[in-house]
Amino acid sequence: MTTFRSILKLVWPLALGMVNNAVMQFVDRTFLAHSSLAALEAVLPAGILMWIFAGFFQSVVGYSSVFVGQLHGAGDEAGCRTCYRAAKWIAVVSGVLMLPLVPVGEWMLAWSTTSAETLAMEKTYYDITLLGSFFIYGQMAAASYFTGRGRTRIVFWVNLLGNALNIALDPLFIFGIDWNLPLSAFTVSLRLPAMGIAGAAYATVIAMAVQWAVLAVVAHRSMARDGEAATSSGCGDKGDATFLSRERTLDILFRILRFGVPSGLYTILNMLSFTVFVFVTGGVGELELAVSNACFTINYLLIAPMEGFALGASTLVAQAIGRGDREDAARAARRTVLLGVGVALGLSVVVLAFAPLVLGLFASQAGASSAEFHALGWTLLVLMTAWQVFDAADIILSGALKGAGDTKFVMVWLLVVAFAFWLPVVFAVRHFHNTMPALWATMIGYVLVLFVGSVVRWRRGTWRGIEVASGT
């Protein structure tokens, strides 16, 4: 039976890993801000566009964790290894498919950017990170192999290693080095030219490559060890006779695509809808935009752990279904939602308690009136707390639905609510009452409707009849 303690044991490395990624992005942008204003302006649109493309393939590859989870729950460790091989093939193909997206992205950036200097930097960052996204997919395939089996600490420590390397390389690559190290008989000169935004991109790609390499080595050693143990025992794992079966690998590969593609589309639609909202809020006013951006930064740091809870819910539900215990799957989802909402509410209360201090970090950088900045900031933080609870609950419950294979509903429901309900309301508010609090208030209705729909879907139990991995 899934207990709160077992949930926390699985989830905390995932949640901290997501926070770790958020901090890394913040540090990246801080270094670029000291490089040039154009670099800071370029990294956000280029990064968003890259992740709109790469996020789809990352989500598809990452869905292999659900298959690993279900097969692990069923005791089919050979099937888990086959899932990893299938995920690696998807990762390779995904990396190749990035090539034609380079000119597509460059055209989109040229269409939306007026400054030649900023456009050149956007293209540089976009090209390097998009072509280097192969390592992201490889890393995700290996990470999913461990996450689905509940070994989340390995993923966390490797993630921490990669992000620490990224932060260490950032200043060296962005600003360059010119060191003369005197030794006993001669002097060693170390020189690296300043690469600006290209350096930040290279640092990110190198860090991802290191994460992929470490996880891949550990995964292959684990697979070899498990395979040898199964062979020497004389009985093996369930499905061990098909360990090298191409037919089973292809079957799992196409099943991952069947359920993973809607999950990838969900990621794209989520990013697109939120990007449109951010662009709409940019037309309210300079002070309002500065405050909104500051609060969005805070919100990102708070919501990042919920992505870890969602992945944990997906894994726990998948493992329970693999064991044939769908009641425990429901219990795991319910308890993970409760824990996640509690954490989200607690973090929001802490932010509100220290709101003057938190907002003060951004007010000085914005060069705005402190009183006006703090007044509007407080209002937006209160609204953020209101939607944070429902947003956290929906993110985690959507993760549970994905773990049960109900990815089409999650994708279609987001499409309908975001583009047929929320964004039309946002544009109407912009036309009739163009204030930042009014625009932010629409987020509460948006995430509330999303959550209610997810709850109804979960309680109807459609997910109980979905078969994800064959043989479970």
Task: State each model region's role.
Residues M1-L14, V68-F134, D178-V261, V317-A386, ...:
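Short alpha-helical transmembrane segments in multi-pass integral membrane proteins
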Residues T2-T30, H34-S35, I48-F67, A91-L99, ...:
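N-terminal transmembrane alpha-helices
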Residues K9-D28, I128, Q139, G162, ...:
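Transmembrane helical elements of multi-pass membrane transporters/channels
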Residues V19, V23-E41, W107-A116, I174-D178, ...:
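Helix-terminus/linker motif at the lipid-water interface of multi-pass membrane proteins
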Residues L37-I48, E122, Y126, E286-L301, ...:
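Small-residue hotspots at the loop-to-helix junctions and early N-terminal turns
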Residues L40-L99, P103, I136-G150, I154-V155, ...:
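Small-residue-rich hydrophobic transmembrane alpha-helices
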Residues I52-G55, N166-D170, W212-A216, L301-A304, ...:
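Hydrophobic transmembrane alpha-helices of multi-pass small-molecule transporters
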Residues Q58-V61, S65, T129-T147, V155-N163, ...:
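Short runs within selected transmembrane alpha-helices of multi-pass transporters and secretion channels
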